Amino acid sequence: MQNRNTFSWVKEQMTRSIFVSMMIYIITRASISNAYPIFAQQGYENPREATGRIVCANCHLANKPVDIEVPQAVLPDTVFEAVVRIPYDMQLKQVLANGKKGGLNVGAVLILPDGFELAPPDRISPAMKEKIGNLSFQSYRPTKKNILVIGPVPGQKYNEILFPILSPDPATKKEVHFLKYPIYVGGNRGRGQIYPDGSKSNNTVYNASASGIISRIIRKEKGGYEITIANALDGRQVVDIIPPGPELLVSEGESIKLDQPLTSNPNVGGFGQGDAEIVLQDPLRIQGLFLFLASVILAQIFLVLKKKQFEKVQLAEMNF
C-alpha cells in the first residue's frame, strides 16, 4: 500500500514538473520571439545616447532610411498623428532564426518631448483607430511615457506606423512650455546581426577565426557547418561553427586568411533614425494673430473707403 502511494506521489510530481517546464518554455519563447524591443529596454535606461545615436543601431548594423511626419504645430491637450515610415522592398526575404527564409518584421522607437505621451483609447477617434489597426504600443519605461516602442510587427502590413499622441497642457503641467520641441525616431526592418550579449545572430557574415587551410567542412543535420582550419606552420586546428542561414563561400582545401569571410552576408534589413520638430502652440497667440489680421483687413477697408471718399471730393471740386 505504501509503495503504491509512493508511486502515485512520484508520478504526480513528475507530471507537475513536466507541465511547469512546458509552461516556462512556451512563455520564454513567446517573450523572446515577440518582444525584440525588450532587448534595448533591458540593456539601456535611455534609448538615445548622448551622441544622439539610438541604441538599436548596436544590433542592427546596416544603415537604412526612416521617415517621420508630424504636424508643424499642435494645441495643448490635443490628439495628433505621428506617422513613421519604414520603407523596404516587399519582395525581400530574410533569414529566420531556424535558417529558413521568411518575411521581414519592422519595429520603431519614438522619442517624444517630456509631457507628450500615447493618447488614451477614449481620446482616439474612430478614423484614427482604423488607421492604427491592431498595433499595440508600449512605453519604454513606466516612468518614461514620452518614449514609445512598437514591434516586431509584419512589415508587409505595417511598414507605415501611426502613433496617436496626446500633447501636454502647460496649464496643468508646469514643466511644459509653449515652445518648439524635437522628436526623434528610430526604425528597423528585419532581424539584427548582434544580440545584446555581443554574440552573432545567423543574420550576418561569419569570418575565419584563423588563417590556414580548410581541412574539413561538416554539414550539420539541422543546418549550418563546422569548418576546420589547419594552421600550415604548426598544424594547430581551429573549428569555426556556422549556424543555419548564411551561404558558404569556401570549400575544403582552400587557403584562407584571418577574418576572411566564410559566408555571404544574408542581411537584407537595417536600421535608420531621423528627427522632426513640433511647436506646442499657445491658443492665445492664435487668437492674437486672428485679431491682428482682422485689424489689418479693417484698416485696408477703411483706407479704400477713405480713398474713394477723397476721390469723390476731388471730382466735385473739379466740376464746381
UniProtKB/Swiss-Prot annotation:
Binding site for heme: Y36, C56, C59, H60
SUPFAM superfamilies: Cytochrome f subunit of the cytochrome b6f complex, transmembrane anchor, Cytochrome f, large domain, Rudiment single hybrid motif
Cofactor: heme
Gene3D superfamilies: 2.40.50.100, Cytochrome f large domain, Single helix bin
Keyword annotations of the record: Chloroplast, Electron transport, Heme, Iron, Membrane, Metal-binding, Photosynthesis, Plastid, Signal, Thylakoid, Transmembrane, Transmembrane helix, Transport
Cofactor note as given: Binds 1 heme group covalently.
Classification via InterPro entries: Cyt-f_TM, Cyt_f, Cyt_f_lg_dom, Cyt_f_lg_dom_sf, Rudment_hybrid_motif
One Pfam short name: Apocytochr_F_C
Position of the signal peptide: 1-35
Subcellular location: Plastid, Chloroplast thylakoid membrane
Membrane topology (UniProt): Single-pass membrane protein
One GO molecular-function entry: heme binding
Tree of life domain: Eukaryota
Record-annotated membrane-spanning stretches: 286-306
Any GO BP annotation: photosynthesis
Keyword Ribonucleoprotein: no
Assigned GO CC terms: chloroplast thylakoid membrane
Function description: Component of the cytochrome b6-f complex, which mediates electron transfer between photosystem II (PSII) and photosystem I (PSI), cyclic electron flow around PSI, and state transitions.
Similarity remark: Belongs to the cytochrome f family.
Subunit structure comment from the entry: The 4 large subunits of the cytochrome b6-f complex are cytochrome b6, subunit IV (17 kDa polypeptide, petD), cytochrome f and the Rieske protein, while the 4 small subunits are PetG, PetL, PetM and PetN. The complex functions as a dimer.
Protein name stated in the entry: Cytochrome f
Organism: Amborella trichopoda
